[in-house]
Curated annotation (Swiss-Prot):
Lineage: Eukaryota, Fungi, Dikarya, Ascomycota, Saccharomycotina
SUBUNIT field: The APC/C is composed of at least 13 subunits that stay tightly associated throughout the cell cycle: APC1, APC2, APC4, APC5, APC9, APC11, CDC16, CDC23, CDC26, CDC27, DOC1, MND2 and SWM1.
Domain of life: Eukaryota
GO terms under cellular component: anaphase-promoting complex; cytoplasm
Residue stretches spanning the membrane: none
Entry protein name: Anaphase-promoting complex subunit 9
Gene: APC9
Pfam families assigned to the protein according to its UniProt record, in alphabetical order: ANAPC9
Length: 265
């Protein structure tokens, strides 16, 4: 009985068979097939060497090694420029997605979204020429087209992001729009202090010397001062308006009875 039981147990026990795509031989044979256009291995090699030609490799190798493989300096520079061009073509989509591989259409949509966000932040309408070659991930500045347009049309307030700044006139705003931050003369700090003091005193007198003015910052003070000026203008208009006096009850009765007496006559 025991021998028969051991034989039956030996027949029942079997190692689980692995599917063909999980075997080590299959994985080793198809390891090179998991490549995408973005992660494609370079086909250019140096003298049957598996190391691809990039800018870092050319910098590490000395001039003697380069001449040893029968390559001129011009050829090395040409290959170096090609490698930099390939690096610039690859768009860095890692801030938007954690996946290692994506389709070209998805990467293109990420790039268009980033370009649109740039236009919303730094432009009111967008790029004048509608350029699609701008790369926000490589260059911060999109070019001088918008600056030339602003300098050619200084009267056009529609293209200016800065509409009003405390203590700055129209010429100062035009300089800021042209990114002329560095000036030869020092800024007129006394003029700015006078403006801030004038606004602070006006708010204090209107609020009956309240301590709230001291807790506000300069830009909040300027906003409150503008609101105060609008309110004072409205109050002045109401006072200057010719208002009809309210008729009293005695005058209403007299007018009523006088009309009745005239009707009897």
């Amino acid at each position: 009985m025991n021998q028969n039981g051991d034989k039956n147990e030996g027949k029942l026990f079997q190692l689980p068979s692995l599917p063909p795509w999980k075997t080590p031989r299959f994985n080793k044979a198809n390891f090179n097939n998991f490549t995408t256009p973005l992660r494609k291995r370079s086909t250019r090699v140096i003298n049957d060497d598996s190391m691809p030609i990039t800018g870092e490799v050319l910098e590490e190798r000395t001039a003697d090694d380069l001449y040893g493989i029968n390559m001129d300096v011009d050829e090395v520079d040409y290959l170096n420029t090609l490698s930099h061009i390939e690096e610039e073509k690859q768009y860095d989509y890692s801030p938007f997605c954690e996946r290692n591989t994506l389709r070209e259409s998805r990467i293109d949509s990420f790039l268009k979204a980033e370009r649109a966000a740039h236009c919303l932040v730094f432009h009111k309408v967008g790029h004048l020429d509608g350029i699609d070659s701008y790369r926000p991930d490589i260059d911060i500045m999109c070019g001088e087209e918008a600056n030339k347009y602003d300098s050619a049309n200084p009267e056009g307030n529609g293209s200016m992001l800065l509409e009003s700044v405390p203590g700055c006139n129209k010429e100062d705003l035009e300089r800021l729009s042209r990114r002329e931050f560095v000036t030869n003369s020092k800024p007129n700090m006394r003029r700015l202090d006078d403006i801030i003091n004038h606004e602070t005193n006006a708010l204090k007198s209107f609020w009956n010397d309240s301590g709230l003015v001291n807790s506000l910052q300069s830009h909040h003070l300027h906003e409150e001062y503008l609101l105060l000026q609008e309110e004072l203008k409205n109050v002045y208009k109401i006072k200057c308006h010719d208002r009809v006096p309210i008729e009293s009850l005695r005058d209403k009765c007299r007018r009523h009875y006088s009309n009745e007496d005239s009707s009897f006559l």
